[in-house]
């Protein structure tokens, strides 16, 4: 195709690409353009904190403490994300969430201070202090159970869910039609105990949730 000023335009593009500016749209020019476009399309997209937390949590499924001690090589790493002594044995469901947040925000520019609490319900206090900084607390839980429009808060994938029985986990999907939500939790077991000793995927009744914390 020919048009006035075509050669100068091609030269300008070639200079931007860092190749010989001869004004000819030959194979070298087109290959350079193709390689640059291909490279841009293959760059990984930046993921959200919630997405990173879910992916991290899934990769930790199966981690267990040693002999019911609330301790173990990986478990102690979770506990080190809190302000308590990781070498001592104590319930670590909240520590697991602290660890997920810490790892997910690494190399990300965030306004909030990361949680370091070992208490499940104390996560609500942390969230209140960080509201307006990329953290939102939804409580009472009745406000979030039934989505009616796009503006209504709702349990989403990557939300931190605080349970009524002093336990905490991470939602890995939206509530299902059976009234349950899939979660990944630390310090639980097959029976759903809050002191079960492993990182597992669970299905919890939405009615057992007392609050939801969303990080954006």
Please place each PLM-identified region on the residue numbering.
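Long, low-complexity intrinsically disordered regions
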Residues: 209-216
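Acidic helix-start/capping segments at beta-turn-to-alpha-helix junctions
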Residues: 25-31, 74-76, 120-124
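Short acidic, glycine/serine/threonine-rich helix-capping segments at coil-helix boundaries
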Residues: 1-45
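...with weaker cross-activation on analogous glycine-rich loops/strands in unrelated enzymes
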Residues: 107-192
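N-terminal capping segments
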Residues: 38-111
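Glycine-rich catalytic cores of cysteine/serine-nucleophile enzymes that process amide/ester linkages
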Residues: 69, 73-88, 162-206
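Short, functionally critical alpha-helical segments immediately adjacent to catalytic or ligand/cofactor-binding
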Residues: 26, 56-58, 98, 158-163
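Soluble non-cytosolic domains of exported or imported proteins
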Residues: 3-8, 24-27, 47-51, 87-95, ...
